[in-house]
């Protein structure tokens, strides 16, 4: 090649193909190379291609809470896909350390971690990508007189979007909202309606194929005709439900259950050590 000849630019399709095989940390760094590369790696096509290949090599996510230091560290390691293969020791990769002023309650979806932390006098939700180190502190949507609110993160597999559902406490009104991350949408989100007033029992939710499931309870009038009770509360009985929220159509459905239990998919396996550290394996 003569010195005066210019190298032909690499086709964008080839760049996307190459970088879709790289770790998330590398992709995050390459997004900062230029505006062109940043926009290229934000394309829905690249996101879907990268997620598809990432699912083919799943990883276990470990969260180590330092109880005395009010902080936690995030690690991950490859997940063995061959159950017949002889187990081997694997060194977990360190991703990030985060300091919080309260014990966060973790759950995850599509590689993101969702937890709560103290900001001033109030608890605010945080969504974090441990592989890239990026995080977003989300707004507290309820007014200051509201005591409690809950938030859940989920993935819309059709539109390829990460969304956050905010649910206010029943005593605080019906200010429920949905926020789509990575858009120009206002951080206050869009208000949505829920036909069933319910008490959320835990902010541990499970998102499967774009549908969020979480535990809740409602108060219903008792069908009993027994008037011998002196307690007005006996005129009502508790009804446990599983709330189903479809992130695609942004609609609620409800499954009435006759017993109280725990969503086993949301269980975090915890191991407390003598050093006052707790290791959570998020499934």
Swiss-Prot record:
Please give the superkingdom of this protein's source.
Answer: Eukaryota
GO CC, one annotated term: nucleus
Listed under GO biological process in this entry are:
root development
Q: Which InterPro entries match?
A: F-box-assoc_dom_typ3, F-box-assoc_interact_dom, F-box-like_dom_sf, F-box_dom
- CDD domains from the UniProt entry: F-box_AtFBW1-like
The F-box domain covers 4-53
* Full protein name: Putative F-box protein At1g60370
